[in-house]
């Protein structure tokens, strides 16, 4: 199928890089601003340094370069004595004024003759670069939070509010550590012939706030078609991400890549090979409970719908490797009344190499069903899109003979890329007269028309997902799962039009769509909730996962943020009124 590539139409470049008092930044110090109001690029300031937040006139470049050389020489000269005299009580104001700031550093590096250098007074090593789950107030508190390395999975980007991003912050002091004697005493034994090297303090908390702010400003620049500014910010994001650890660094790197692809219009034209996608999804399945929860809750609803039925037929919109169905086959085999005849129709896209992967999956399921003495029929159905399906293609039998169930896990949102596609598919599903329709979707709104809002929502959502992955004990599964999610991030941020298929919507939005199409909700029973809770309890390192019931649907989230939702539906008796 031929695909079209759509991109946002360029918008007029704004008169300034940023306007309004609410754009005050955290970059560098409290009185420094990332972007001064009404910045004029031709006002004598060096443009590249201005983008990074430094005010340097082009005419002063030679003088600043000379001072930087002097600063480097001074730093080398104090290696034997350390930096204990540096900035005990001195506040360095406005480092955006690069010339004055470097000059103040030079002054600090030449202490008075009477100053006493204490061997134990070194700058403290940097704390963990992970930003913890902190509720930032509009004004940052004077006492900084200390972030331990063990809390790398506690970071929740959602906790960083817009007011925290743009409000002014108090000036910081650069202080020496009080415990450096213990830190360096062991290394001094037997190594006294080596000169003590100055320790550079990396404020990971500060950089983390700058990183979030740079991501947001870059998204705004992209939306305003200010691509020069956006390009410079992407480079800064990469620089700031290096100082972070764990989920924060990984999320920022994926979003920076996606922003760069959008800036340079490099949206991936060809999807990954089907085998690669299946491999990544399998690692995602193993590393965290999201897919397990999706399959388990859907299977529980299907099992209850099949109670007492002799012949059952599942139409799966998300066949992939068929990992959902062995558990259902086993549950049907254990029915007190005996297993029914089970027919499965698996639907999937064509493979790039034209291999019949759906048939291979079917053979594995047939062999598995034989071991459990379940009469099993399988048919694989290849379709470029679910919108290409017609009920007549599926060899449906009368409802008196065979009970039909339709299952969709993370598939329906892709139909939103094509106008009218979701309405057509839901109409076809209704023609199938299913006993139940199980739907699992991401609990997020990544389908809004405004790019900045979509970017912000996806940044919050995937930050939480990556945070939960930090609990995965298997590093290979975790790495592959991050690649799996990174592909989604790239599609949400970098692509537009028909190419943007990761159009996730919330449970509330899906309720509106399905109700408008003539479906009534089915409440998932309390048994499904209890069983899902047991599943999470058995999942290793799963203390942060939470199951909650929402008006008959079940949600799985990380701490307080729901991430996926399972709902069940049946065709309503009332006819759909066309609007």
UniProtKB/Swiss-Prot annotation:
Q: Where is this motif: LXXLL motif?
A: 412-416
What PTMs does it carry? Answer: Phosphorylated. Ubiquitinated. Upon GA application it is ubiquitinated, leading to its subsequent degradation.
- One of the GO biological process terms: gibberellic acid mediated signaling pathway
Which stretch carries the motif VHIID?
312-316
Q: Which UniProt keywords apply?
A: Gibberellin signaling pathway, Nucleus, Phosphoprotein, Repressor, Transcription, Transcription regulation, Ubl conjugation
Q: Which residues form the GRAS domain?
A: 202-570
Report the GO terms under cellular component: nucleus
Q: Where is this region: Leucine repeat II (LRII)?
A: 360-392
Q: What highest taxon heads this organism's lineage?
A: Eukaryota
Per the Swiss-Prot or TrEMBL annotation, the motif DELLA motif is positioned at: 46-50
Similarity annotation = Belongs to the GRAS family. DELLA subfamily.
- State the protein's name: DELLA protein GAIP
Species annotation: Cucurbita maxima
């Amino acid at each position: 199928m031929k695909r079209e590539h759509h991109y946002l139409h360029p918008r007029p470049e704004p008169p300034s890089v940023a306007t309004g008092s609410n754009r005050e930044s955290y970059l560098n110090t409290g009185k420094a601003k990332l972007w001064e109001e009404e910045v004029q690029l031709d006002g004598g300031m060096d443009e590249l340094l201005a983008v990074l937040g430094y005010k340097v006139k082009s005419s002063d470049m030679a003088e600043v370069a000379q001072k930087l050389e002097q600063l480097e020489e001074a730093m080398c000269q104090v290696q034997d004595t350390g930096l204990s005299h540096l900035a005990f009580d001195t506040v360095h104001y406005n480092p955006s004024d690069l010339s004055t700031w470097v000059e103040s550093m030079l002054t600090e590096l030449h202490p008075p003759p009477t100053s006493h250098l204490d061997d134990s007074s070194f700058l403290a090593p940097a704390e963990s670069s992970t930003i913890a789950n902190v509720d930032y107030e509009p004004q940052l508190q004077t006492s900084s939070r200390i972030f331990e390395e063990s809390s790398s999975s506690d970071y929740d980007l959602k906790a960083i509010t817009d007011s925290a991003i743009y409000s002014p912050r108090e000036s910081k002091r650069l202080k020496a550590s009080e415990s450096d004697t213990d830190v360096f005493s062991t290394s001094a034994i037997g190594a006294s012939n080596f000169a003590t090297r100055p320790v550079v303090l990396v404020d990971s908390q500060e950089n983390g706030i700058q990183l979030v702010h740079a991501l947001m400003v870059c998204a705004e620049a992209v939306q305003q078609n200010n691509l020069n500014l956006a390009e410079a910010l992407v480079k800064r994001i990469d620089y700031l991400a290096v100082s972070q650890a764990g989920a924060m660094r990984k999320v920022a790197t994926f979003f920076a890549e996606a922003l760069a692809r959008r800036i340079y219009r490099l949206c991936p034209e060809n999807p990954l090979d089907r085998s690669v996608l299946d491999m990544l999804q399998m690692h995602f399945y193993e590393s965290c409970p999201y897919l397990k929860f999706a399959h388990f809750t859907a299977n529980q609803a299907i099992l209850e719908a099949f109670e007492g039925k002799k012949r059952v037929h599942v139409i799966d919109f998300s066949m992939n490797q068929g990992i959902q169905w062995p558990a259902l086959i086993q549950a049907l085999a254990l029915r007190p009344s005996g297993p029914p005849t089970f027919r499965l129709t698996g639907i999937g896209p064509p493979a790039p190499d034209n291999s019949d992967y759906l048939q291979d999956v079917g053979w594995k399921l047939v062999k598995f069903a034989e071991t459990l003495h379940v009469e099993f029929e399988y048919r694989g159905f290849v379709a470029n899109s679910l919108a290409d399906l017609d009920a007549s293609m599926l060899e449906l039998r009368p409802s008196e003979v065979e009970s039909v169930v339709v299952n969709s896990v993370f598939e329906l949102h892709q139909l939103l890329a094509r106008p009218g596609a979701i309405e057509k598919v839901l109409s076809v599903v209704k023609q199938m007269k299913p006993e139940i329709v199980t739907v699992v979707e991401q609990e997020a709104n990544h389908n809004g028309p405004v790019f900045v809002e979509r970017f912000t929502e996806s940044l919050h959502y995937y930050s939480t997902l990556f945070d939960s992955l930090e609990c995965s004990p298997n590093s290979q599964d975790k790495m592959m799962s991050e690649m799996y999610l990174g592909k989604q991030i790239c599609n949400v941020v970098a692509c537009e039009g028909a190419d943007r298929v990761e159009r996730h919507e919330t449970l509330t939005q899906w309720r509106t769509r399905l109700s408008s199409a003539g479906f009534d909700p089915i409440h998932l029973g309390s048994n499904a909730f209890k069983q899902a809770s047991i599943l999470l309890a058995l999942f290793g390192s799963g203390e942060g996962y939470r199951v909650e019931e929402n008006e008959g649907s079940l949600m799985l989230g990380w701490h307080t943020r729901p991430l996926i939702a399972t709902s069940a539906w049946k065709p309503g008796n009332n006819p759909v009124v066309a609007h």
